[in-house]
Amino acid sequence: VGEAIAKKATELVTTGKLGYYENLKAEFPEGITNLLAIPGIGPKTANRLSGELGINSVDALEQAVKSGRVAKLFRLGDKTADNILQQIQALRRKDQRIPIGDALPVAEEILGALRSMPGVKNLTAAGSLRRFRETLGDIDLMGTADNPKEVIDAFVTLPHIGQVLAQGSTKASAIASGGLQVDLRMVEHDSFGSLLQYFTGSKQHNISLRERGHRQGLKLSEYGITTIATDKLEKFAVEEEFYRRLGLQYIPPELREAQCEVERAEQGSLPKLVELSDIKGDLHMHTDWSDGHNSIEEMTLAARDLGYQYIAITDHSGGRGIAHGLDEERLKKQIAEVRALNERLSGIHVFTGIEVDIRADGSLDLPHEILSKLDIVIAAVHSAMNQSEERMTKRVLNAIENPDVDIIAHPTCRLLGEREPVAINLETIFQAAAKNSKVLEINAMPDRLDLNDIHAFRARDIEVKLAIETDAHSTAHLGFMRFGVGVARRAWCEPQHILNTLPLEELLAFLGGDR
């Protein structure tokens, strides 16, 4: 360290400031560095925005673009102005993870459009999306085609795509709807398997594979597996063959997080993960009796169309006044309607139920006399979420120990990107659920995914039964089941761990006390 740097370091430590840095800052308008963080805005543009329009923040720039002031200053067209807005959205997401509920529909629209093109052989998601992480940084897509350039050209002109960040003959990056960055890579068919494996990740999983390969005298890369002694490269069109070459059972993408999946794959003892087709019904949904948008019959028919054997109608209880919750009298009427519907419809069974509020003191907001008449009782916290860990844990324990309760819904109460989980001792909750033979929910609402994969893995590990439920408030929401299944797969869940993989007769036995 030289004398000048030593002086600056001493000044910074003793005063908390650095005069040299403060002098540099004074030469630039306040907040201009915020503008420079936006891709496409350089020093000259930022200086004009600040000096001529008084814009020194991202928020101010957004408002100026929307009002047309920026377009007027720089004589920009509508598309350029829209690109600036998309870059602002992308910047705001840069330090945030994108919920899978936002990313997956965008990816599926793009994939659907490109798969219809002639000559497209393979096209799929990779990265965090393929591993079904609950949040992701961007969307990675890859595929093979007879004419890769045609696919790339079509990709950048899709209606979902805004600004193109980069484009070549086999790769492109662009900003899609909502500021999502999408990267598309077209590869050679004979290398598709190894490239898909590499770009699916995770990074630590791939490191584990490389270490294993090295011990076998092999070098792994995105292009295939090279035998070090002969420098011979093997390419893999099929991902399963890549794993087989390493002496491993195929590892599903959801498990590739460097836990113990490589060791288990070596032993051939990976779980047979639950699949969407294993789900026999949905036990948590709402109708227009409370805050849902469809009638009981409409929800039932939609579920039957999905091939379900059963559903449970679990509208909110009266404590959720904002949700038009059911009091005892309305619940009695709903029970009668459900029973009449069961007599009239065939091909599906409808369970009576309720999502009853767990009050702040741990009591339920409906009495035993009415709860005991229901087929399924789900209990959930919807209020007083700022309680201490001790009080919240005791509150939920009271519900678990209540003989009327079957399932605890969204146990941590989180909302992705909006509300942090409540303070609760989940290990205590899991142990109590196991002891009392109670079911914990994997709520499949994309903004909940609660329990998450880590918590669901622990619950499964101590033999707590889980239920994947959509919490649907409309017929369209029934499709959210796939998000819950993704969480369960990441939690290493097999069908036997999930309550609603049971056929109707077995579920009836379970609810009747055969737990």
Where are these regions (language model features)?
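Two-metal-ion RNase H-like nuclease active-site motif
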Residues: 123-125, 281-285, 355
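Accessory alpha-helical DNA-binding modules that contact the DNA backbone or grooves
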Residues: 1-172, 193-195, 207, 214-228, ...
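Hydrophobic pocket-lining residues within nucleotide cofactor-binding pockets
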Residues: 129, 356-358
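Short linear capping/connector segments at secondary-structure termini
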Residues: 26-30, 317-319, 355, 414
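Charged catalytic cores and adjacent phosphate/nucleic-acid-binding surfaces used
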Residues: 132-218, 222-287, 293-313, 318-349, ...
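Short acidic-aromatic active-site loops that bind/stabilize oxyanions
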Residues: 100, 288-289
